[in-house]
């Protein structure tokens, strides 16, 4: 009888304790450590799996990785540049272009379909175009601080380095829609950047200003849709001092041997391009592109871009850059895409920085640079 009563009392205590949150099993902190370890292990196994957006599912499924190099043709590519780019991009969804800004020759394109056909909003990389437009139209200059709201002032160098949206929105409002489009077209936006690349598709420029103001065009790139090829051409023109080359991708050793640079046009206001360099270097040294890795002996100049594409809801991470090693320059452009908030311009800058680092490790920049053909000087071009 006493034994039965004891058993009943124990059961009552257990049930009552459970109801009031009293536990008799594994302590909470220990259970948390076990759960955390398990979650970390699971997360590590699907670290690069994209997330589903807008779909309700009872069970999360890790999607298989897509090889960004699948379908690429490596014929005629600089294999050292390609190896550096492939290793830097890894399994991330995106594209990398490596090019010679002094000739327009493409050395490697990783994920060629995205690089040739992926037209997205340029995000803050449009500030390169806006900066030159503002300088050439006399709206801004490099030294003078630009007064913004709340008595805050900022100069061009800091505005580029920190990608200040208010600064460039003000520039856009003063430029007006027609001037913004004019300078965008001068840099090659809305047209093919490459020459004789059959699969390439051009970006586009909206026929009307954004409904939320001109400032969105020059701070976030709203109204423009740009391919990685177009950004590579833009950065190449900045790097070489104002010559917009057609980008060419040789597909054989014969085409490499017979390569002749082709000029599309000379930029109007090219004399102002040197004013962009301190800000583009500052972005890498202390601004939005710090992940690229600053080096005083092998400086990188770049501009990040982070936004969500209005048409596709794709999250974007852009980085357009070039470096200087002695008398050599190399352009590296990165576009990262994702269905989730897992990409950004700073992350893209880290990919580009890894490309440069990989090439330095291969002693790439100690090799003789390919010489530009004199034919480039007599190619037909149009000035804006």
List each model region and its residues.
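Extracytoplasmic/secreted envelope proteins and their assembly/folding machinery
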Residues: 78, 82-86, 126, 156-160, ...
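Active-site SXXK
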Residues: 85-89, 104, 118-143, 159, ...
């Amino acid at each position: 009888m006493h034994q039965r009563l004891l058993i009943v009392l124990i059961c009552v205590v257990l049930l009552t304790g459970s109801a009031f949150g009293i536990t008799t099993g594994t302590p909470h902190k220990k259970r948390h450590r076990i759960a955390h370890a398990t979650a970390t292990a699971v997360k590590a196994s699907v670290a690069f799996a994209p997330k589903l957006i807008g779909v309700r599912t009872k069970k999360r499924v890790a999607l298989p990785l897509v090889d960004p190099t699948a379908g690429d043709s490596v014929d005629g590519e600089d294999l050292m540049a390609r190896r550096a780019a492939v290793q830097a991009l890894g399994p991330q969804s995106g594209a990398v272009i490596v090019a010679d800004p002094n000739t327009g020759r493409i050395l490697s394109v990783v994920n060629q379909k995205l690089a040739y056909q992926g037209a997205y909003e340029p995000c803050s990389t449009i500030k390169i175009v806006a900066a030159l437009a503002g300088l050439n139209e006399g709206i801004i200059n490099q030294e003078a601080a630009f007064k913004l709201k709340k008595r805050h002032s900022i100069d061009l160098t800091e505005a580029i380095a920190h990608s200040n949206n208010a600064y460039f929105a003000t520039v856009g409002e003063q430029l007006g829609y027609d001037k913004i489009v004019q300078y965008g077209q001068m840099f090659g936006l809305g047209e093919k950047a490459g020459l004789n690349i059959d699969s390439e598709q051009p970006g586009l420029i909206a026929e009307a200003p954004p409904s939320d103001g001109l400032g969105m065009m020059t701070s976030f790139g709203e109204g423009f849709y740009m391919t990685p090829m177009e950004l590579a051409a833009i950065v190449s023109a900045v790097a070489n001092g104002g010559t917009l080359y057609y980008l060419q991708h040789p597909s054989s050793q014969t085409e490499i041997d017979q390569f002749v640079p082709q000029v599309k046009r000379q930029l109007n206001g090219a004399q102002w391009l040197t004013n962009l360099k301190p800000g583009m270097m500052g972005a890498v040294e202390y601004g939005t592109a710090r992940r690229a890795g600053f080096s005083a002996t092998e400086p990188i100049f770049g501009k990040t871009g982070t936004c969500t594409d209005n048409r596709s809801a794709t999250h974007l991470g852009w980085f357009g850059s070039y470096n200087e090693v002695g008398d050599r320059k190399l352009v590296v452009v990165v576009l990262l895409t994702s269905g989730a908030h897992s990409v950004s311009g700073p992350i893209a800058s880290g990919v580009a920085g890894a490309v440069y680092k990989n090439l330095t490790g291969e002693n790439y920049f100690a090799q003789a640079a390919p010489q530009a053909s004199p034919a480039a000087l007599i190619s037909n071009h149009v000035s804006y």
